[in-house]
């Protein structure tokens, strides 16, 4: 299990990223500096579970899945459907140790369902709605000493990145060489 402090560091980093208050926001040499923005989204840990019961650890539901690690299929077919909270009320995030078959994966997100957004697949099951991040990349080493975290992916950016997908954003290169990301104001990626 990762520490509460590691989880809090991740929420803090997410808020910095989405509110545009992170250190990168001040870097005028960054190519996206002129078009960055505060998207006015703030994340918090819920003080109650999906049934309205106060939680000993707000927003943290520690689940013993009786396994050392998880394959993506096991996550999608076992872990998520049995532990998901109402996705209309909660943003579901799972941290796991990926199985050897998925060991190179930092995380992944389910695109939103039935958005009508061009380029976003429809009919994603509600029972798997959310984001999965490997526990070694969850949190920000800039905000504490978390020995389980592994550089260079220890800055809390994996969840920020995957959350963008969860909101319906594709990679700016459209998952291909200068392909389409379906957002008109994204500068061309080279």
Where are these regions (language model features)?
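Acidic/histidine-rich, surface-exposed loop or edge segments in extracytoplasmic proteins
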Residues: 1
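…and closely analogous acidic/polar surface helices at protein-protein or active-site interfaces
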Residues: 4-8
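Metzincin-family zinc-dependent endopeptidase catalytic domain
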Residues: 12-190
